[in-house]
Amino acid sequence: MCIRDRERREQRHRDNLENGVALETVIRDYLSPKHRDRAATGCPTAALVAEIARHPKATREAFTGKMSDILALMAAQMPEATPAEQRRRAIAAYATMVGALQLSRAVSDRQLSEEILENAVDAALALAKGR
């Protein structure tokens, strides 16, 4: 059940990006306290990325394909930039988002967790906008 919920959430993020939901909305949703607090049904990337790194090449290739899809969807929402710049910004924003979500879940200090999320939203938005 847990994996299915995660897959649905990941698909919702993809659907949002494909359907033109503003990248800012996706970033804010991903880095929300609600998403942080629902680790069991949240993003599989944030939950499993360290484990995926230890898996065979075939698993990592499947992960790479899914991640590449997400990056392409994010990059497409970054107008007024070259394709290379869009990709660079998408990678930086997504890495910020995933890392911040992991850290916000790992710390025991609730205030620090909130600060991580809030600052990561600002950072990811700045990266997405090329600032």
Spans of features found by a protein language model:
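Generic helix N-cap/helix-start motif at coil->alpha-helix transitions
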Residues: 6-10
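Conserved small/polar residues in nucleotide/adenosyl-binding loops
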Residues: 1-5
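Active-site oxyanion/phosphate-handling segment shared across diverse enzymes
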Residues: 67-77
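Helix-loop "lid/cap" segments that line or gate small-molecule binding pockets
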Residues: 31-36, 45-55
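Hydrophobic alpha-helical connector segments
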Residues: 11-42
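Hydrophobic/aromatic-rich alpha-helical bundle segments in the mid-to-C-terminal region
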Residues: 57-64, 77-131
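Amphipathic alpha-helical segments within well-ordered protein domains
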Residues: 14, 49-50, 75, 101
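Alpha-helical bundle regulatory/interaction domains
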Residues: 20-23, 29, 55-59, 103
